[in-house]
From Swiss-Prot:
Lineage of source species: Eukaryota, Metazoa, Chordata, Craniata, Vertebrata
Note: Encoded in an alternative reading frame of the T-cell receptor gamma chain gene which is composed of variable (Vgamma), joining (Jgamma), and constant (Cgamma) gene segments. Originates within an intron directly upstream of the Jgamma1.2 gene segment and contains three exons from the Cgamma1 segment.
Tissues of expression: Detected at low levels in the ductal cells of the salivary gland but not in the acinar cells (at protein level). Expressed in endometrium (at protein level). Expressed in epithelial cells within the acinar ducts of the prostate.
Organism listed in the record: Homo sapiens (Human)
Pfam families found in the cross-reference section: TARP (PF21951)
InterPro entries the record matches: TARP (IPR054133)
Induction, as annotated: By testosterone.
Name used for this protein in its record: T-cell receptor gamma alternate reading frame protein
Coiled-coil regions listed: none
Length: 58
């Protein structure tokens, strides 16, 4: 059985698969991080709106 050298297309497809998986992980992490950040900012904004230091104690 003769062994053929792997084609550049095969290497390219493998690289594309790996990079797309990495990009997917990055995007998922960014989405989760931004959601947490938005939730934190929303809670903080809500808290400052409820407990405004100019009005004194809540």
């Amino acid at each position: 059985m003769q062994m053929f050298p792997p084609s550049p297309l095969f290497f390219f497809l493998q690289l594309l698969k790996q990079s797309s998986r990495r990009l997917e992980h990055t995007f998922v992490f960014l989405r989760n991080f931004s959601l947490m950040l938005l939730r934190y900012i929303g809670k903080k904004r809500r808290a400052t709106r409820f407990w405004d230091p100019r009005r004194g104690t809540p």
